[in-house]
Amino acid sequence: QADPNAFYGLM
């Protein structure tokens, strides 16, 4: 499962 924080970092 990917980390939600990583997704936010991309944004």
Curated annotation (Swiss-Prot):
A matching Pfam family: Tachykinin
Domain of life: Eukaryota
Residue positions where Pyrrolidone carboxylic acid is found in the record: 1
Localization, UniProt: Secreted
CC annotations in GO: extracellular region
Keyword tags: Amidation, Amphibian defense peptide, Neuropeptide, Pyrrolidone carboxylic acid, Secreted
GO biological process: defense response; neuropeptide signaling pathway; tachykinin receptor signaling pathway
Signal sequence interval, chain numbering: none
Tissue expression notes: Expressed by the skin dorsal glands.
Methionine amide modifications at: 11
Protein role: Tachykinins are active peptides which excite neurons, evoke behavioral responses, are potent vasodilators and secretagogues, and contract (directly or indirectly) many smooth muscles.
Family the entry assigns: Belongs to the tachykinin family.
Entry protein name: Uperin-1.1
Source species of the chain: Uperoleia inundata
